[in-house]
Amino acid sequence: MAKRQLNRRQNWRIEKIQNERAARAAKREQHALQELEGGDLGPEQLGLVIAHFGVQVEVEAQDGEFAGQVFRCHLRANLPALVTGDRVVWRAGNQGIGVIVAQMPRSTELCRPNNHGQLKPVAANVDLIVIVFAPAPEPHPNLIDRYLVAAEHAGIRPLLLLNKADLINDENGPALHALLEVYRDLGYPLLEVSAHHGDGMQRLQQMLDGHISVFVGQSGVGKSSLVNSLLPAADTRVGDLSEWSGQGTHTTTTARLYHFPNGGDLIDSPGIREFGLGHVSRDDVEDGFIEFRDLFGTCRFRDCKHDREPGCALLEALEDGRIKQQRMNSYRSIIASLPEDSY
């Protein structure tokens, strides 16, 4: 059945109701915060945001008498938006409730535009972004390259992870191996695992230890299954592939940080089908294609669009095999998707 289209008045009414609900929730939160701060609060101490629930977050105490304990915390109104992975200064209150009073500087942040095109951080202080894909749903090089550009732009080291390796067969194997070979030749770290059978999981754990990692990738590639295999106590819900669309059903609804036994953390974030890059410039995209970097600026024409122009360094590199057609297609697609003012 086709989805019913709403008229302008209906959309306005829905937005009005949502804004009113948000205002009431904010008012209740402010009242609770005032009551909390009116009582006895403990000293300032360091904490780590391990989950975010709208107007409240879960904070794990990093020092002091409460080290290792988790508190549900209110946010002071003057704080910037916090995300999982943020380091904060907080004060403990009564009944396991606390107040966050300051945000510590971030070493990195992973951002994506929201539905309104506004830039929104989704994880903080991450130093390893694990790009997960699988034989099914069919991996899209363009999406993988978007994640790689985002990782390069954020200064976060990427790891390409092929999950469900047990599903590789004679039919999909040649295309998958050709896909992997492109990234292997570029020097990107790459690992094949099966969360279901356990193949390669010990090696994955070793590569994650000592890092703050985040798993990204389209729904249905097994991110939740990977978390359950690495951390059985996490009990992340798993969704099956939709039989109708072949795409994954979204399962994880809240970004949460988990600790590995041997050190390091993992942030499990909601599944993303399309990762927007509207917040990056053309220069950022060009820098994100690592094998293209030395070629930009060497074309015959300064305003070369790398399409059909004579003397184009990218086209010459494409012709002699120094860059792959797959990557060239992704580059053109990503550049075409940027807002005009990004040029």
UniProtKB/Swiss-Prot annotation:
Does this entry carry the keyword RNA-binding? yes
**Could you confirm whether the keyword Transferase appears in this record?**
no
| Subunit structure, interactors included | Monomer. Associates with 30S ribosomal subunit, binds 16S rRNA.
What are the alphabetically sorted keywords of the record? Cytoplasm, GTP-binding, Hydrolase, Metal-binding, Nucleotide-binding, Ribosome biogenesis, RNA-binding, rRNA-binding, Zinc
NCBIfam families assigned: PRK12288.1 (NF008931), ribosome small subunit-dependent GTPase A (TIGR00157)
Its annotated function is as follows: One of several proteins that assist in the late maturation steps of the functional core of the 30S ribosomal subunit. Helps release RbfA from mature subunits. May play a role in the assembly of ribosomal proteins into the subunit. Circularly permuted GTPase that catalyzes slow GTP hydrolysis, GTPase activity is stimulated by the 30S ribosomal subunit.
**Chain positions recorded as GTP binding sites:** N163, K164, A165, D166, G217, Q218, S219, G220, V221, G222, K223, S224, S225
Cofactors named for this entry: Zn(2+)
- Mention one GO biological process in which this protein takes part, according to its record: ribosomal small subunit biogenesis
A Pfam family cross-referenced in the UniProt record is RsgA_GTPase
What is a single molecular function from GO for this protein? Answer: GTP binding
The subcellular location is:
Cytoplasm
One GO term describing the cellular component? cytoplasm
Entry similarity comment: Belongs to the TRAFAC class YlqF/YawG GTPase family. RsgA subfamily.
UniProt: Zn(2+) binding residues: C299, C304, H306, C312
**Could you say which EC number(s) this protein's record lists?**
3.6.1.-
Domain (CP-type G): give its ranges: 116-275
Q: How is the cofactor bound?
A: Binds 1 zinc ion per subunit.
TM ranges: none
Task: Give the coiled coil ranges.
Answer: none
| SUPFAM superfamilies reported for this sequence | P-loop containing nucleoside triphosphate hydrolases (SSF52540)
Q: Which gene encodes it?
A: rsgA
UniProt protein name:
Small ribosomal subunit biogenesis GTPase RsgA
